[in-house]
A protein has these predicted regions:
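Conserved N-terminal beta1-alpha1 strand-loop-helix module at the mouth
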Residues: 2-96, 100-104, 111, 117-119, ...
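Acidic, divalent-metal-coordinating active-site segment for phosphoryl/phosphodiester hydrolysis
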Residues: 183-195
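A short, flexible beta-alpha/helix-coil linker loop
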Residues: 46-47, 147-151
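Short gly/ser/thr-rich secondary-structure transition/capping motifs
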Residues: 122-126
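Generic enzyme active-site microenvironment
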Residues: 41, 179-180
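Acidic, Mg2+-coordinating phosphoryl-transfer loop and its flanking beta/alpha structural elements
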Residues: 197-202, 207-208
Length: 225
C-alpha cells in the first residue's frame, strides 16, 4: 500500500493531566474540555516499571465523576493485568498497556477488550515496532513513546516519527490510531502530523501555554508553515 492510499484517522488531542496542578484537578478537567480536547491522558506509574509514582484507581474514579471526557488511561506499570479490572470499573474508556510490562500481551489485551473497553499497546523508544505486529488485529491504538517514560517535560526523541511511518505501512487497510507521548510542542507538531501520528498527548505544551486553546488548535492542524 502506497502512502497516497493510507487514510490516517482524524486527529485527537489528549492533554496529559500529569502536567496539571494536582491540587486543582477539577479545574484542570474543566479547562481541558473548554480548550476543545476530546481525551484526557492519564499516566499511571508504579515506581517499578518507571522511576516515578503518580496516581491510581481512585483518581480515575474521581475524574469520571467530574468529567465526561474520554479517559485515556496509560498504565506504566509492571504486570498491568493485576489492575486492569479496577481501572475499567472506575471509568476508564481506554486502557493502554506496555508491551514490555506483561508476559502474555495477547491475554492482557483480551482482558481489556472482553469488558467492552478500547485497548492500546505502548512501546518505549528503544522497542521495535514488531513488538506489536502480531496483535494489531486485536487492538485500537499503538502508543509510541517519544521520550523515556517516567517523567513529564522531557525532550522529544525523533525516531518515533519513522516508527509511525513504518507502522502505517504495516497496518495496511486496517488503520488504527497512533498516539505519541513525550516532548510534543508547536516546534515539532508539523513533522509529527506528517508522520501519520493522529493522537497527540501534550502536557507542558498546553498547561504552560499562554493561550492553551490556540496552542491546541496548532497541535491539531499544524502550524501551516
Amino acid at each position: 500500500m502506497s502512502n497516497q492510499e493510507i487514510t490516517v484517522p482524524k486527529t485527537i488531542i489528549a492533554p496529559s493531566i500529569l502536567a496539571a496542578d494536582f491540587t486543582r484537578m477539577e479545574e484542570a478537567l474543566h479547562s481541558i474540555k473548554e480548550w476543545g480536547a476530546e481525551w484526557v491522558h492519564c499516566d499511571v506509574m508504579d515506581g517499578m516499571f518507571v522511576p516515578n509514582i503518580t496516581f491510581g484507581q481512585k483518581m480515575i474514579e474521581d475524574f469520571r465523576k467530574k468529567s465526561d471526557l474520554f479517559l485515556d488511561v496509560h498504565l506504566m506499570v509492571q504486570a498491568p493485568e493485576r489492575y486492569i479490572d479496577e481501572f475499567i470499573a472506575n471509568g476508564a474508556d481506554m486502557i493502554t498497556v506496555h508491551a514490555e510490562a506483561t508476559t502474555h500481551l495477547h491475554r492482557t489485551i483480551l482482558q481489556v477488550r472482553n469488558q467492552g473497553v478500547k485497548v492500546g499497546v505502548a512501546i518505549n523508544p528503544a522497542t521495535p515496532i514488531n513488538a506489536v505486529e502480531e496483535v494489531l488485529g486485536d487492538i485500537d491504538m499503538v502508543l509510541l513513546m517519544s521520550c523515556d517514560p517516567g517523567f513529564g517535560g522531557q525532550p522529544f526523541i525523533p525516531y518515533a516519527l519513522e516508527k509511525s511511518r513504518r507502522l502505517r505501512k504495516m497496518m495496511g487497510e486496517n488503520q488504527l490510531d497512533i498516539e505519541v507521548d513525550g516532548g510534543v510542542s508547536e516546534e515539532n507538531i508539523d513533522e509529527i502530523l506528517d508522520s501519520g501520528i493522529n493522537v497527540i498527548v501534550a502536557g507542558s505544551a498546553l498547561f504552560k501555554a499562554k493561550d492553551p486553546k490556540k496552542t491546541l488548535e496548532v497541535l491539531r492542524y499544524g502550524t501551516g508553515r
